[in-house]
Regions:
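Flexible loop linkers connecting adjacent transmembrane helices
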Residues: 46-72, 94, 100-104, 116-149, ...
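Transmembrane helix-loop junctions in multi-pass membrane proteins
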Residues: 13, 44-48, 87-92, 101, ...
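Membrane-interface loop-to-helix entry segments
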Residues: 32-39, 43-56, 176-182, 189-238, ...
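N-terminal alpha-helical transmembrane segments of multi-pass membrane transport
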Residues: 1-86, 96-103, 410, 440-441, ...
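Helix-loop-helix module between adjacent transmembrane segments
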Residues: 36-41, 110-135, 141-204, 367-377
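Extracellular loop-to-transmembrane helix junctions
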Residues: 21-58, 97-134, 314-322, 362, ...
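Extracellular/periplasmic helix-exit of transmembrane alpha-helices
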Residues: 41, 120-129, 232-248, 260-262, ...
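Alpha-helical membrane segments and immediately flanking helix-loop junctions
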Residues: 66-98, 124-127, 133-142, 146, ...
Length: 491
């Protein structure tokens, strides 16, 4: 039995971490992310609107040209693996319970702003990436903080924070989601779940970044597409309810069905919960997807900016919306806004699908949660690997992190470590603040790269390499540091 003093001490730590996390995510970070979205939308003159065609077409040909490294599509898939996670099912359900259907509209608006932020951080990751001895690339917030702002120590702080949160704690959190889902659907014991989790994660994590990218390349898009097809089939077979669900989203966002007394409260609840879910689901500005973006091989930095912006669209406007429509279509028997949020959110989507298509769907939905959590482990660990490579290139460092992640996944499968999970939230929040400040300070580089791409757009490859980005482009504030891009002057 643990001493009372120890229990009291741990309780105090939990309380402090929970307070810091709530302050970060409820107000501070939320408004910073919104501000960043507005800032980059204005700074890039609405890149997500002006270049919708380029964003939509960014996936075409993105699987080519890695030269042994990570393709643009693989970097997109790794980012998608983290974006499209269990939060798209549980998190959206929680937003609907707390904010009602109106939360979805605000989620959409935040996603539209977030595409500009995602574009900017991915472009910066490409601009300031470095070439490794094996010919592959590494980039991300730690690198553009160091090489762009000239602050290597701050880059190291970001790397340490993200390494711990994504490389050690995230495997615990997602492994617990896997075993909980299997236990709820079929009564699988946590110990057997731990064996399964370790058996699935060890070969991929120990295989390094390329192995993780190859797995994510197929699993993440396939599971997202399978879920979208399932929900689309439900909507097509329930057209009346689907139309009512869409109507409830508009009315709920502006409180059109509420009396004057409940108007302000209803709109506020919808706005806050929709904004939070939109911000933290698509990860725009948090820094994680930029770690994947900087590892890709592309001919122009903006190409990776477009494809990561497309990831935000897929995550929020497609996958989150699918969940947000499926639940209201199931009816009031399933969705009861304001009721027992924590107890209901975990199973609300599964309950809605089962209500619409039958109880047989619970096992496929459990499998979906398992795969989403599994791909999130892979995606998050790849972020940690990039951060580790910034700190050290020693082989023992990579192997230690890989083994540690597998052990943490095993522990998380059988135990709920609330304090550790809250610590991860705090670390990720602090890392996001560092990243957002760096993004704003480096925004002129984003604008310069975008102007360079716009000037070169439409150039024929028959004219030579005129359409390929150069590190000393006239549109950049200054020539880029050496290490990744070629130069017109032959530096």
């Amino acid at each position: 039995m643990a001493p009372l003093g120890r229990i009291s001490w741990m309780g105090q730590v939990d309380a402090v971490l929970a307070s810091v996390s709530d302050m970060l995510y409820s107000w501070g970070l939320m408004w910073l992310l919104i501000g960043a979205g507005v800032f980059f939308t204005v700074r890039t003159r609405g890149v997500q609107v002006r270049h919708t065609d380029a964003i939509a077409a960014s996936v075409v040909g993105s699987r080519d040209g890695s030269h042994g490294g990570i393709t643009s599509f693989q970097a997109f898939a790794v980012g998608l693996a983290c974006r499209v996670g269990t939060g798209n099912i549980v998190g959206v359900a929680l937003a609907l319970i707390l904010g009602g259907p109106g939360a979805v509209l605000w989620m959409w608006l935040v996603a539209i702003l977030g595409t500009a932020t995602a574009f900017s951080e991915a472009t910066l990751a490409q601009l300031f990436k470095v070439r490794r001895p094996d010919g592959t690339f590494r980039g991300g917030p730690a690198y553009y903080i160091s090489r762009g702002l000239g602050l290597p120590i701050l880059g190291g702080v970001f790397a340490v924070v993200f390494l711990i949160a994504n490389g050690l704690v995230m495997p615990m959190v997602q492994a617990n989601a896997i075993t909980a889902s299997l236990q709820g659907a079929g009564g699988l014991s946590p110990s057997l779940g731990a064996v399964l989790v370790v058996a699935l994660t060890a070969p991929v994590l120990l295989g390094g970044l390329r192995a993780m990218a190859r797995v994510a390349e197929y699993l993440a898009p396939f599971m997202a597409l399978a879920y979208l097809v399932l929900v689309l089939a439900i909507l097509l077979t329930h057209p009346v309810q689907a139309l009512e669900a869409l109507t409830s989203i508009i009315e709920g966002a502006f409180g059109l069905r509420q009396g004057l007394g409940g108007l302000a409260g209803g709109v506020t609840a919808a706005l806050l919960n929709g904004v939070r879910r939109g911000l933290f689901s698509n990860e725009a500005g948090l820094g994680g997807a930029a770690c994947a973006a900087g590892s890709a091989t592309v001919s122009h930095p903006v190409q990776q900016g477009f494809i990561q912006a497309f990831g935000v669209v897929v995550d929020t406007l497609f996958v989150c919306t699918a969940t947000a429509l499926a639940i209201p279509v199931a009816g009031a028997d399933v969705l009861q806004p304001g009721a027992s949020a924590k107890e209901s959110a975990g199973t609300l989507t599964q309950d809605a699908i089962a209500h619409l298509v039958g109880e047989w769907s619970r096992w496929p939905m459990a499998l979906l949660v398992v795969v989403l959590a599994y791909t999130t482990i892979i995606g998050a660990f790849s972020y940690a690997q990039v951060c580790l490579d910034y700190l050290t290139d020693r082989p023992w460092g990579a192997r230690t992190l890989q083994i540690g992640a597998v052990i943490c996944a095993g522990i998380g499968s059988v135990q709920q470590l609330t304090t550790v999970w809250t610590l991860a939230d705090v670390l990720l929040g602090l890392g996001a603040i560092i990243n957002l400040v760096a993004l704003v300070l480096l925004s002129r580089w984003v604008v310069g790269a975008l102007r360079d791409w716009e000037a070169r757009r439409g150039m024929s490859t028959a004219k030579g390499d005129q359409s390929v980005f150069r590190g000393d482009s006239e549109y950049l504030p200054a020539p880029l540091p050496e290490g990744a891009w070629e130069y017109s002057t032959g530096r």
